[in-house]
UniProtKB/Swiss-Prot annotation:
Record: active site: T7
Record text on subunit structure and interactions: A double ring-shaped homohexamer of HslV is capped on each side by a ring-shaped HslU homohexamer. The assembly of the HslU/HslV complex is dependent on binding of ATP.
InterPro entries in alphabetical order: ATP-dep_Prtase_HsIV_su (IPR022281), Ntn_hydrolases_N (IPR029055), Proteasome_sua/b (IPR001353), Proteasome_suB-type (IPR023333)
Protein name per Swiss-Prot or TrEMBL: ATP-dependent protease subunit HslV
Length: 180
């Protein structure tokens, strides 16, 4: 059986609000949609942190557990937990094989965490990952720049995923949006 992957995750800080959205499609290889309603965005650490994954499903669950453990260990300090997780992820021979990326955020900070040791905080309060990530990122930036006074963070996140779903074959319209 092939690898299960492909998705789009989008996160935004906007006017004091934060939201993260993910689609529900799980694709096996490049040909078969195996699931339409996967939940790839979750609340962690007593509902104070949002995390979303793109990549291999089994790997992502491992990373969710690992990140939540780091959040507990560092008492909810998002940046410290992300840096320590990235160091462990990059430094461990087995963990380096994991094929996934995470976006993690709380009310003040948003970070992209990857297995190559990257922990990146965006300048503009927007991140997107996955196969439709560039489409969602473009849509989100345009919405935030030109319609920001009329839209909430949740509305920007949902609309960005809808636009990505219209373009990317690995992204569907079963969108889950979580807010803090």
């Amino acid at each position: 059986m092939g690898n299960f992957h492909a998705t789009t995750i989008f996160a935004v800080h906007h006017n004091g609000e934060c939201a993260m959205a993910g689609d529900g499609q799980v694709t096996m290889g490049n040909a078969v949609v195996m699931k339409h309603t996967a939940r790839k965005v979750r609340k962690l650490f007593q509902g104070k942190v949002l995390a979303g994954f793109a990549g291999s499903v089994a790997d992502a669950f491992t990373l969710f557990e690992m990140f939540e453990g780091k959040l507990e260990e560092y008492n909810g300090n998002l940046q410290r937990a992300a840096v320590e997780m990235a160091k462990q992820w990059r430094g461990d021979k087995m963990l380096r094989q994991l094929e996934a990326m995470l976006i993690v955020m709380d009310k003040t900070t948003m970070l992209l965490v990857s297995g190559t040791g990257e922990v990146i905080e965006p300048d503009d309060g927007i991140l997107a990952i996955g196969s439709g990530g560039n489409y969602a990122l473009s849509a989100g930036r345009a919405l935030k720049q030109y319609a920001s006074e009329h839209l909430t963070a949740k509305q920007i996140a949902k609309a960005s995923l809808e636009i990505a779903g219209d373009i990317c074959v690995y992204t569907n319209h079963n969108i889950i949006v979580e807010e803090l």
